[in-house]
Amino acid sequence: MPNKVFNVAVFFVVFRECLEAVIVISVLLSFLKQAIGEHDRALYRKLRIQVWVGVLLGFIICLAIGAGFIGAYYSLQKDIFGSAEDLWEGIFCMIATIMISMMGIPMLRMNKMQSKWRVKIARSLVEIPHRKRDYFKIGFLSRRYAMFLLPFITVLREGLEAVVFVAGAGITTQGSHASAYPLPVVVGLICGGLVGYLLYYGASKSSLQIFLILSTSILYLISAGLFSRGAWYFENYRFNLASGGDASEGGDGNGSYNIRKAVYHVNCCNPELDNGWDIFNALLGWQNTGYLSSMLCYNIYWLVLIIVLSLMIFEERRGHLPFTKNLQLKHLNPGYWIKNKKKQELTEEQKRQLFAKMENINFNEDGEINVQENYELPEQTTSHSSSQNVATDKEVLHVKADSL
């Protein structure tokens, strides 16, 4: 019954994706309040409307795509899977595990996520393209309708990611129905919006951090369960091929599982047959039959997660991975080199100049952004006070970044 009304995995996935979108929205609204505020109430209202129109339009598009995708899946499910349903379920579980694992850790790094988006928003507002073809990119087009395009693109991107993640997490939930999607999506959006509200109005960071830690822990419990269930589905698929039928149709007793690969089996608590146990299946990956592969996968997942988090803590304190001087975790990601992100990284001085230039942004009557193109930072006057000035600059940068 629960998986017919509320899919727990879908809720946490939607909440995570909504979280990053509301961070961008809160940063933009804070920037407008600081840059315009009480100086021009009419322009302030106009730009705020641009922000919310962009959010609403991006959300409607994602909602339509997600509804169409889920509706098509459940209407064509039997035709797509046929007798290989367990095989596809296992594949979906593994894919969902990877995606959910990657999205969980950033929830613990709320401050870094906010800083990342402050820099992205600042660059998109103040940088000018040097090539003609770049004038059609978001960085330049955002000059005219920046307060519309930035939230629209962000909500659209996060929403499309959510559609993919929800498909992976929801489809792999035992006994899940299409009716189990609307409620967790709505509740996830409400919770994400509530966190954004607390960020905008400056709620206690400690209480917010506790909430995010609990949410991330539950998210990883779901992910570990998905990984274990993926291995279980593969074992069940092999057993069905050998037995020539669907093992679940045999109930809980003999003939319903592969006794040669099973570590334990209980003749009850079947998530496919007994109401209530499907909740534990969705949250923890519970099965009444424990295969060696599924149990190993569950424990290996937590072992790998502990190692990764330990490396991140070490890197946070030392600035590099153990036994190396210049290697960080991001350097192990192939996307870092494929996308050439090294050239896009900014030094602290470049960030200081970027935020200083952002301080000179103003809006005309049409809401178009104007930037002083020839603005330069004042140079240091004496070498004797250079170290004090650098420290002061870092404090100013920190204050400016927090004020956004």
From Swiss-Prot:
Molecular function as annotated in GO: ferrous iron transmembrane transporter activity; iron ion transmembrane transporter activity
GO biological process, one term: arsenate ion transmembrane transport
Membrane topology summary: Multi-pass membrane protein
Coiled-coil regions listed: none
Positions of disulphide bridges: none
Keyword terms: Ion transport, Iron, Iron transport, Membrane, Transmembrane, Transmembrane helix, Transport
Transmembrane segments: 8-28, 51-71, 87-107, 147-167, 183-203, 207-227, 294-314
Compartment(s) where it occurs, according to its Swiss-Prot or TrEMBL record: Membrane
Keyword Secreted belongs to the record: no
Any one Pfam family match given in the protein's UniProt record, by short name: FTR1
InterPro entries: EfeU/FTR1-like, FTR1/Fip1/EfeU
General remark: Present with 8370 molecules/cell in log phase SD medium.
Record's function text: Permease for high affinity iron uptake.
Family the UniProt entry places it in: Belongs to the oxidase-dependent Fe transporter (OFeT) (TC 9.A.10.1) family.
Name by which UniProt lists this protein: Plasma membrane iron permease
Organism expressing this protein natively: Saccharomyces cerevisiae (strain ATCC 204508 / S288c)
Lineage: Eukaryota, Fungi, Dikarya, Ascomycota, Saccharomycotina
